[in-house]
């Protein structure tokens, strides 16, 4: 099984935290890092990544022209489709390919997902599993029904068709432009269950996130955690800091709570990975080679031509 994440250098600490959790809980998985930078910084190497690959080194065309169209927010998502293709071509003996966002932490082996990928070419998780909060539902319609912080693809004709289609769309349109119906790589996947044989995975223990706290019961039994009775597999710590803590304040009771415990534990590990200094790392594609900063309006004008 191949697990990969895609980042710019300012997220190395998050990717390292993810990789640690993968190696601890899914030791048979290969953990691959796709890095959207001009060079690999020495600090990135360590025992948790099986390989670190620059996106530009496996890109089929002119990467500088492609990446010039994108902001740092868009960049690491814009390469995901092609990187799936690259991994499927490179690792011919592997049949399961999983993308995880860098701000995810794995708590146990992906038993159910392994089984699902034996029967389904595409496995995706929706943001919401229950109706009830109209603000959350509106947000989901704007940003994407499915959370692309996770995606599972099996080696199959259908899975490859989906990845090829997605990669082609991201090559042309992977922007943060909700007004035009685009939200990076994610909004495209609203169409995937219409076009392809995709499994909407409704196991509560996968892709649990701060936005899940409103409608999900989480409990601890001995040393294990359960979401609506399903064993916890991974948490997506999206919005670490203000956003996640606001969700906890608004939706959790005062006092002790299993999610608060998990959040505090994750933050300790995350911060121990040199988060304060790494998060300030400048993006190497933010400037011309002369050193001059590239204005966002220049990027937008370039993409429109």
Regions found by a protein language model. Give the residues of each.
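Glycosyltransferase catalytic domains, chiefly GT-A lineage
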Residues: 1-305
């Amino acid at each position: 099984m191949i697990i990969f994440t895609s980042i710019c250098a300012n997220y190395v600490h998050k990717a390292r935290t993810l990789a640690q959790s993968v190696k601890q809980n899914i030791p048979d998985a290969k953990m691959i890092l796709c890095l959207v930078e001009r060079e690999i910084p020495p600090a990135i190497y360590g025992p948790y990544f099986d390989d670190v690959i620059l996106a530009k080194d496996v890109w089929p065309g002119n990467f500088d022209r492609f990446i010039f169209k994108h902001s740092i927010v868009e960049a690491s998502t814009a390469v995901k489709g092609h990187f799936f293709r690259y991994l499927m071509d490179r690792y011919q003996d592997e049949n399961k390919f999983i993308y995880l966002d860098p701000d995810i932490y794995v708590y146990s082996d992906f038993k159910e997902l392994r089984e699902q990928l034996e029967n389904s070419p595409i496995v995706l998780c929706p943001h919401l599993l229950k109706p009830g909060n109209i603000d959350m539902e509106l947000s989901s319609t704007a940003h994407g029904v499915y959370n692309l912080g996770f995606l599972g693809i099996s080696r199959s004709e259908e899975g490859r068709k989906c990845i090829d289609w997605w990669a082609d769309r991201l090559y042309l349109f992977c922007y943060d432009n909700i007004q035009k119906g685009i939200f990076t790589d994610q909004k495209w996947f609203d169409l995937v269950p219409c076009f392809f044989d995709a499994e909407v995975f409704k196991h509560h223990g996968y892709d649990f996130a701060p936005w899940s706290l409103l409608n999900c019961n989480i409990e601890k039994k001995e040393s294990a955690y359960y979401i609506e009775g399903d064993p916890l597999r991974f948490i997506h710590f999206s919005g670490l800091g203000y956003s996640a803590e606001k969700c906890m304040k608004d939706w959790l009771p005062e006092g002790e709570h299993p999610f608060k415990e998990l959040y505090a534990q994750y933050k300790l590990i995350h911060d121990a990975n040199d988060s304060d200094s790494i998060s300030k790392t400048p993006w190497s594609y933010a400037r011309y080679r002369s050193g001059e900063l590239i204005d966002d309006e220049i990027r937008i004008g370039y993409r429109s031509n």
